[in-house]
Curated annotation (Swiss-Prot):
Its main location: cytoplasm. It is found in: Cytoplasm. Its EC number is 2.1.1.74. Signal peptide: none annotated. GO terms for cellular component: cytosol. SUPFAM superfamilies: FAD/NAD(P)-binding domain. GO terms for molecular function: flavin adenine dinucleotide binding; tRNA (uracil(54)-C5)-methyltransferase activity, 5,10-methylenetetrahydrofolate-dependent. InterPro entries: FAD/NAD-bd_sf, MnmG-rel, MnmG_N, TrmFO. Catalyzes the folate-dependent formation of 5-methyl-uridine at position 54 (M-5-U54) in all tRNAs. One of its GO terms (biological process) is tRNA wobble uridine modification. It catalyses: uridine(54) in tRNA + (6R)-5,10-methylene-5,6,7,8-tetrahydrofolate + NADH + H(+) = 5-methyluridine(54) in tRNA + (6S)-5,6,7,8-tetrahydrofolate + NAD(+); uridine(54) in tRNA + (6R)-5,10-methylene-5,6,7,8-tetrahydrofolate + NADPH + H(+) = 5-methyluridine(54) in tRNA + (6S)-5,6,7,8-tetrahydrofolate + NADP(+). This is Methylenetetrahydrofolate--tRNA-(uracil-5-)-methyltransferase TrmFO. Keywords: Cytoplasm, FAD, Flavoprotein, Methyltransferase, NAD, NADP, Transferase, tRNA processing.
Amino acid sequence: MKEVDVVGAGLAGAEAAWQLAKRGIKVRLFEMRPKKFTPAHQTPLFAELVCSNSLGGINLDNAAGLLKEELRFLDSLVIKVADRNRIPAGNALAVDRNLFAEEVTLRLSHHPLIEVIREEVVDINPERVTVIASGPLTSKALAENLKKYLESDYLYFFDAVAPIVAGESLDMEKLFFAGRYQQDKDYLNAPMNEEEYLRFYEALITAERHPLKPFEKDIYYEGCLPIEVIASRGKDTLRFGPLKPKGIIDPRTGKEPYAVVQLRRENLAGDYYNLVGFQTNLTWKEQNRVFRLIPGLENAEFIRFGVMHKNTFINSPALLTPYLNLKKYPRLFFAGQITGGEGYVAAIATGAWAGIAASGMFGKMPEPLPETTMLGGLIRYLNTAPVENFQPMGVNFGLVKPLDRKIKNKKERYKLLAERSLKDLKRWLAVNG
């Protein structure tokens, strides 16, 4: 019987299940929530976005934008649902996280070839075709069981989540809507003068943090650093990072502020706002104190405080084939952030590829993806990165095979890389679709 187990119904597992089912393969989709939650999840919904509600850029000269377009070519359910539940966020694809997760859950739960099993998986059968998409917060029992197939210890880094505040608790007299360089006015901005910035900075770097366990090193993913860690690198680091004012004009002064905090809508109604770039490991008491120093947030009601959690991933270059299955146990596939592909869209993409590849176990395996595509480049990285110091990687144009000729203008170069990628993916689909 053509049947595959998918462990975990996050972004990667949801997409893998969809890709398998659309190819006529029965899926048993395991999800331990709501019986057991991870430190970051809050709902039993599939594809819950535990960090930001943004899936990154939409333009094709943006790496995440190109990868999303490739996924549309692959008929990605998760991207299709994201497009349908989009909320204004300038050049980014941000979604109403609840409507998004609810629709993914509904679509998969009602698919005739997908059986949803709400149980924690603690034991893997290497004889069954299985996609392991248990995420960077894989349960302790499953992680221990997987060790016998991985023959190595897990790697890890710390990831952090930004707080969310209630829109009605904000002082809109001190805030304004604007985008950078007078683009779409989709972000709410809290401008700071120098005095306000320095007061906030001093409070931030001296605030109490949740302690790490004695045996844990403070290894962070550079793409999602806690804001207090960024601040500790220098007084002006924030002003060139998440609080940079470049391109934002305060309508009350007609000038760029000294620094600016941006807030992004969490839903279409604007009931909730995410503090952009404010991933944090501060204690909740300190978040209340420090973040209320931001102009307009003096009486902010925190719907969710920022938290930090340990993310686990495997040494993919040592363990996986280009199809994301184990070299020694070829029926076991891996997908999502546990592979070391960092970020939402990389998780969806590796889920899509693992699902497509796993379907090949019942017939003919697909040809490897072209390395000229963003997805093909990401898979190549997961296969060929240095084994000794393997680190998670977010999508970027450095993953894609270079053009035959040099193009100095970066925007033009990325545009040509994107055009080539989609053309080559169309050719691949004509043979492997």
